[in-house]
Amino acid sequence: MLTDDGKHLYVSWDEYHRLIEKLALKVHASGWEFDQILCLARGGMRPGDVLSRIFDKPLGIMSTSSYRDDGGTLQGRLDMAKYITMPKGELAGRVLLVDDLADSGVTLRAVVDRLRAMPAISELRSAVLWVTGVSTYT
């Protein structure tokens, strides 16, 4: 539901989880086989967790932050964690990158560029719940 000023979208938890289930169906329908999931904290943690459980794949977490100003609604400088948290081993093979939102696309582009520079990753694809009309990452 959009606010009266049209600036904010409010989504119920039920709708949020339905969107995650739809995303899981899209990933499954793609037929792409992946080895691990990497979610971007904070927004990608819940979708990443659910997809990890549905597909029974290890979940890695990378912390990123750029929305700090104006109550967390204005994008600022992008900070990315130096390390990726994994339950065991390293991020490798075919990796599904998961986040909640591709807003400007800056975060996803920066993370993808960093991951593509990692020789242990053989293939990389992304899955997000929402993509804005101005995102440079699709």
Residue ranges and their predicted role:
Residues 1-138:
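PRPP-associated nucleotide enzymes
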